[in-house]
């Protein structure tokens, strides 16, 4: 899952779209192509999904305002995969089936959650339907690792790869926080709590392997996702173990941050750490009065650390000016949608300027090299991964003006925001 990151200036983004995707203006419009979106957008999950949706909408607006690509304009075909406020794999599959049933939808942005991607990829792969996730971080979606309980080739069922992502993976994100906890926070003994999901278990595993390699010790417990509301027995066990911190592998809609709200009452008030699943406004809200000293990673670079970021962030905030319209993966979604539209433009050009097939779009997307996006230049490999390996670390703090923050801020306590602390670049380490 990543936070707002910057691009080269907005006008350059439009120029690159023209150069890589075909003509952006002139001639008569040939019709409208739909970009599917599947994200969790209701209930507790909305704090992650809606800002991500806005990133896609902003990318579509940017391309359309520049005249479209190869005579085509674009529109968003949006689907919510949340059920009762939490992401739902079956709903995600239904959404993808609906997209595939609409011949105007040539690819999709999403899903947000790795468990949903695991369920959707087999359906989309059979239709040669491009998926680009702005936030999936479970490595097993693309990498056949010894620790994986499933295999990427099985998800694709013998079909060519149709799945791509613009973030790095938990086999980098987990170790980054392990290093930060051990070296920066001086935590040598830690509690590890997992929500038992594809994402939560995977990132907790990656964290604890690295933490142990550094010389730390840990105690691990798992809980059953969104059905868990009382964490006091877990916290008491961790306290008795002597843990100096708590790392949670999970997401806010699976109650990962409810545990934070119960730590003081159990006398276990230590630093709270996790992955991008807790880098949300909902997490800060769920933590209640114990909303400071929450440490989270994000699977990409921060906007404040990327040259030229300010221009695109300012432009985005003018288009989407709500206090919670900028989320952890807004700009990744912008990049993902721009990459997809450019691939569609190239496919149309190669098809004589005509509407391309989904397979032609898949081929164009698979051939994407040197795509200049908001957080850097992307080159996708045969599995759909990119070569940007940056992980950022954030901590919740009280800020003077949330409107100027590039971090995610709380809803109930709007001056509590995630503030950037450090980044790890695993491509150069």
Regions found by a protein language model. Give the residues of each.
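Short, polar/charged alpha-helical segment
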Residues: 48-69, 205-210
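Extracytoplasmic "Venus flytrap"
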Residues: 29, 33-57, 79-89, 112-113, ...
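Segments of small-molecule ligand-sensing domains
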Residues: 316-330, 341-408
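Immediate post-signal peptide segment of exported/extracytoplasmic ligand-binding proteins
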Residues: 24-37, 65-73, 182-188, 355
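Beta-alpha junction/loop-to-helix N-cap segments that form part of ligand/metal-binding clefts
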Residues: 21-24, 28-30, 47-51, 66-151, ...
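Short, low-complexity disordered leader/linker segments with a strong preference
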Residues: 1-34, 65, 100, 420-429
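Extracytoplasmic ligand/sensor domains, especially the bilobed periplasmic-binding protein
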Residues: 105-222, 271-296
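Extracellular/periplasmic periplasmic-binding protein-like sensory domains
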Residues: 260-334, 346-351, 416-427
